[in-house]
């Protein structure tokens, strides 16, 4: 794996779904949909949108889970029900309580409409220290960062600039192909 460099597997920012920090959640969904359509034919689809400031610098990331979380009702009663699990209630008991409570919540189309108008900055996650990897880092370094931080992607840097995104799916594909190639060579009696 050491023969791969991060920059060989990353998706350049120019090819990734991005929106300005002034965008709404709906605009971010449209950007993700467009990027998935354009990228689908060649590689794995995008699963996040990068949020850019007015200087085109990455200030956050909005994942599919962040999108879905934006549609969850946000009120104290529901938050208290979610906390039942830490008091020993089973996941099933918590889900049943949530379902019962949600029967009286607003219609889902109203929830979608309200969330769609909110700014992406309300739901995005700002990158943390462990989410950056240098473009010249070896793939094994990136693999460690992905697994140690349970990250689905890493932001690829050149000096202080973010130039791309390294996705778990692309790393997995590279590792899988390297493993397959290595095993086939061993099966044929070759040594490295």
What positions do the PLM features span?
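Residue-level signal for alpha-helical context at structural boundaries
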Residues: 27, 46, 50, 85-86, ...
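N-terminal hydrophobic targeting segments
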Residues: 1-31, 159
């Amino acid at each position: 794996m050491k023969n791969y460099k991060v920059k060989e597997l990353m998706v350049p920012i120019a090819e990734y779904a991005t929106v300005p920090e002034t965008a709404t959640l709906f605009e971010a969904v449209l950007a993700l949909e467009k990027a998935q359509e354009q990228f689908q034919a060649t590689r794995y689809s995008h699963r996040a949108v990068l949020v850019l400031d007015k200087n085109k610098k990455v200030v956050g990331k909005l994942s599919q889970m962040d999108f879905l979380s934006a549609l969850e009702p946000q009120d104290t009663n529901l938050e208290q029900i979610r906390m039942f699990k830490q008091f020993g209630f089973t996941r099933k008991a918590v889900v049943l309580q949530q379902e019962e409570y949600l029967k009286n919540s607003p219609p889902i189309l109203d929830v979608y409409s309200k969330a769609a108008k909110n700014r992406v900055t309300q739901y995005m996650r700002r990158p943390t220290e462990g989410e950056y990897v240098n473009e010249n880092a070896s793939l094994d370094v990136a693999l460690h960062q992905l697994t140690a931080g349970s990250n689905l992607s890493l932001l690829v840097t050149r000096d202080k600039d973010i130039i791309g995104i390294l996705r778990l799916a692309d790393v997995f594909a590279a590792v899988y192909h390297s493993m397959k190639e290595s095993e086939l060579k061993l099966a044929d009696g070759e040594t490295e």
